[in-house]
């Protein structure tokens, strides 16, 4: 129930419906099942919307309507009396939060329109008002709120900024690292530290590899819930644990034994083949068969009796025995067909070989790891101290501060837990452990609602851990009292052709070992409507492979590349779709794993006239030509004796010196000087004192004079003006901004130049000043191999989309092409010199000196890189995690398609005919084979090969060069232009006459309804005021009396470093303060200061607020006391929207605005509006805002059907607060 109080103190009660019981939910499901609605909710959706009172995990497959479920659940909570501000709703991105907020807003507006109950309308209106302040956003945004509000409890200032620019972070990191590195090199334990650095960098002078190690360890620790504890307790966990053969995990032993048994089984299958040749012509066993039988028997015996024969202590002996037993090669050949029977076992043996030697030397690396632990810990502390000093933090810092606040302050934690009715999380599969800890602290233990799909967890590079979702899934299924699992399987996005191929592929591919989830019936996609099941034969999925048997040389040689021929295949299919089926270009999307070859795709499409837009995201801003020219210009202004920058500026379009000009200038050296810079030669050339003044002709002399004069003016301006103004001066002086507008990609080039000025302005606002520091910052960014994000420009709508699979997540497209399916998965991380793991900590490759082991006496040392046991353990887990994520990437890519999916790759047709495995074992591809295959294409071909007797719902087709000729590819059909010769016969035709009549009628209608045409659909009171008010005076400008005109005066320049506070900012701050001010407490300076801390404004604005004037309003005016007396009737910052009729066009439009304050009583309403305008007579503001208050009153009357009896202006722009009744 909700209680409002009328003027007489009597309660007005809203009775809310209770939450549904399980029986009521079942009843609702039955009713929905037999309803007449065209689009019915599924039983699982209903269960997810209405189940309450416990933790809920919703496993929502692709296209299953999870956003719909979340919005409906939120609305149901509101309708049952849970205010929107009592829901914590976390989304993965800001964009997702915005879309969710808009959907909730639309639902609330719709509900208000349907509701006839007055009190319910009031309540829902309050929810609309609260929506903008509700906790709907990313975890980062919420953490910032917590730290801004309670940071003082852990010594963090509320006035901080976020370092979102990676370049700025790298510059600070480098400074901290360099200082700390010097300290460690001079400490007592320096020899161990030098050995550590050499182990990774080779020597102590080149520290780049060691620096990368430290940065990676730091970043990894930041994703944990407590970096300090992880570094102290988990960082060396595996190094301390795995020091003997007995310490090897049982799981690794099981994998080795499984590989041995699989090898025996596969070898038996091969020997049973008809063409194998078990017997000789004489009828006896062949030598090959005898040898293979021995291998089969011994491998089976060793697996069965492992504990008795070997045990963990004898593992090295087992490795030697197996190595001696099996052949060195991988294949067994039968009838010229090779079967890779021993390949997987060889890989496992390689992993375990030399274990005793490794363990012998592994203990020597432990002191090095302790030094690394100390260094990373010290780096973390020092880097944080610098950020605290700068009051600038990364997102992870803010999240850890929020966790610390909630952990260390029981009262704050409990206030949040008591406040939130439910803690809701979208995209739960992409959470990391830091975010999970924060959610746990906010929850009361039984009020979490989590939505996600582990099959779409693709953000491991952001330290997302799908096992968080997986563990919850298992826990809730095993122990229902902990929470409930709800599966949303129905897909409402894709046609059956897409659903069937997705199910066919992943039922053979995905399980707990690779993919992290068994793709069984409970995870398979089901069509959500009958329309999706209508078959279309031409929409069957296609695996189109360019036959590389006779590669024409167009394909790049690197493994990353996509060949010209592959792109041509795509272009051919798109032309066919567009010409034959009329598919618009915007319905087609190309998905790639990375953007490295986008230029090839764009170039090829341009050749065929196919419009294409990319998703952007490339970080090549500083490498764009126009930006490089400007940076060299700035470098030259900073130091003209920088020859590289000076030559670049001279050769640029701004001055256009050619090679001949530069050669003539270069010869103007001073014979007395050995080294002479180009700038000095230019100055000598101008005054004719160079070595060869005769080479400087009049034209060149004129160019030199212009350049030197311009450079001099720029250098002078750089000392006085801002960077922003300097850059625009350069643009204007040499017309460079206009010049790039005439070049290719003009819009992008101008956007880049404009962004350079803005970034320079942002740089100076962040506290850094001067051209030198700006250039130094840019150069450091380039030194660290970083760049700034490209500037986005508007893209054409009617074009094929090209984006990464990651970027496509959450989107859907009618036709999807998955390109470069032959690209090998990136396994770079598993070959690094170190691998990190959350449970095991760090594992490294140790550079051991085995001189003593070899008995070597002539050499100083014999260094061998060894994979330590922790490294091998982490490597295997990382390999499986990488393959799992790639498998989920393929799932995301395939499930974006609505109608048809294409796979594009290249392969050798002859080699692909080789059977990958001799026998199908169960429904899944064998684990060893899935680990071995390292491309999407290999997975698909293996499934097509091994499960060829099944309908896999996709076809494999090889494309030859002959299929990709210009004639075969075809051309886009463009609209046929009219033949001018045919027009002469139509001049007086009836068609032309009718057309002219229609044009005349349209012109007449346009003239009659001109006002309606130009009428906007949405307007605000301020716009209406501006439209009818003859004076255009911005807020904060003094109103000048008409009878007088102020005389011009001279004001001394203002040299304060503090930015001028805008009057509009003060007005916004006042409105925020009046909104959050607690009226239940006595209004005094302390109350106002406490409330001031909670508003979102900078310190300058807060200081500019006149708190004494606000205190005077509440204490000295009758209206201020009225606020405190009737605070239960008060509504503050209330949004509204009403329909109005334009007096000229008689057309309707929507009027929207926000009312500062109003008092709602049983039979009337009192309206209040605050104004900070400066004035001389109150009557002036009364006239100015009279119409605006009339609009507010009209909105309130329409909403509540009550008269507005009083309308007040609270004027805060004078010497004291004044109340004016309007």
Curated annotation (Swiss-Prot):
It comes from the Bacteria. Keywords: ATP-binding, DNA damage, DNA repair, DNA-binding, Exonuclease, Helicase, Hydrolase, Isomerase, Nuclease, Nucleotide-binding. One of its GO terms (molecular function) is double-stranded DNA binding. Residues 524-810 form the UvrD-like helicase C-terminal domain. Its EC number is 3.1.-.-, 5.6.2.4. Residues 39-495 form the UvrD-like helicase ATP-binding domain. The keyword DNA-binding applies. It holds the Pfam family UvrD-helicase. GO terms for biological process: double-strand break repair via homologous recombination. Its cofactor is Mg(2+). It catalyses: Couples ATP hydrolysis with the unwinding of duplex DNA by translocating in the 3'-5' direction; ATP + H2O = ADP + phosphate + H(+). ATP binds at residues 60-67. One of its GO terms (cellular component) is cytosol. Heterodimer of AddA and AddB/RexB. The heterodimer acts as both an ATP-dependent DNA helicase and an ATP-dependent, dual-direction single-stranded exonuclease. Recognizes the chi site generating a DNA molecule suitable for the initiation of homologous recombination. The AddA nuclease domain is required for chi fragment generation; this subunit has the helicase and 3' -> 5' nuclease activities. Belongs to the helicase family. AddA subfamily. PANTHER family: ATP-DEPENDENT HELICASE_NUCLEASE SUBUNIT A, UVRD / RECB / PCRA DNA HELICASE FAMILY MEMBER. This is ATP-dependent helicase/nuclease subunit A.
